[in-house]
């Protein structure tokens, strides 16, 4: 029953990597400013580096796949790889993001992040090593190759528990947090609530596949018997419970996270 320090990408990751709670560091929001709250040399990877480890990283460890280069032995350059696959992105100064259909596994940056880490897991090293592999999905946008949708037929999708008056006993700040007139109102109007859940599950399945690739590489690793695995996420997700979507709330759906240790 693990819960994040704060249900938002940037402050949650800053808390984990710095070991400092948001109310200590001051990092509460997404704003691409986590460097203001975490000094160079304070991060988790920096601690491993100081302890003599070889430290590799790929993907979304900090917010927006950012990293402090001096805190890593090597870190994957994502180049022009996209978290959502090829599409229309920031055309002529405008942020108009639309993903092209018929994606392949390798069209999404997570595939390449796993490739990067798999290659490093295969090497026998003279010094201990730490590898951080940050998978972007199932973050928005909910896009994945179509084959991952087949296990989630639209007519079998079940909506989460919900009642129309669920916010009647919630004070104004809580209603503002839920935002029933934002995402939820749009899904009710469009009739695509189940389609959104289906797409979310498909991105989860895509991530499950990539985690499997990492575990397969771990099984073949020369250091398999002397390796600790930690599986963690930065926040939970709401899919319409209490008329709320996304994270940014203090209900269990948004704060609860997976936390698995294998040693």
Labelled PLM ranges:
Residues 1-263:
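Formylglycine-dependent sulfatase
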């Amino acid at each position: 029953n693990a819960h994040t320090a704060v249900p938002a990408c940037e402050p949650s990751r800053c808390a984990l990597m710095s070991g400092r709670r948001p109310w200590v560091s001051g990092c509460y929001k997404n704003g691409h400013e986590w460097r203001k709250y975490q000094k160079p040399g304070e991060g988790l990877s920096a601690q491993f580096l100081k302890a003599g480890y070889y430290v590799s990283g790929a993907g979304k460890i900090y917010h927006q796949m950012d990293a402090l280069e001096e805190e890593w032995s090597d870190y994957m350059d994502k180049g022009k790889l996209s978290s959502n696959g090829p599409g229309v992105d920031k055309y002529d100064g405008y942020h108009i993001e639309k993903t092209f259909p018929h994606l392949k596994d390798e069209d999404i940056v997570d595939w390449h992040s796993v490739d990067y880490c798999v290659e490093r897991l295969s090497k026998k090293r003279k010094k201990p090593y730490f590898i951080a592999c940050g998978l972007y999905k199932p973050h928005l946008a909910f896009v994945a190759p179509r084959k991952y949708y087949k296990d989630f037929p639209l007519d079998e999708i079940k909506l989460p528990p919900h009642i129309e008056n669920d916010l009647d006993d919630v004070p104004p700040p809580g209603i503002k947090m839920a935002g029933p007139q934002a995402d939820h109102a749009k899904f009710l109007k469009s009739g695509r609530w189940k389609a959104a859940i289906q797409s979310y599950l498909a991105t989860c399945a895509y991530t499950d596949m990539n985690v499997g690739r990492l575990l397969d590489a771990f099984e073949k690793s020369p250091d398999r018997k002397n390796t600790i695995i930690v599986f963690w996420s930065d926040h939970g997700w709401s899919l319409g419970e209490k008329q709320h979507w996304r994270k940014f709330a203090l209900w269990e759906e948004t704060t609860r996270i997976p936390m698995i240790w294998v040693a």
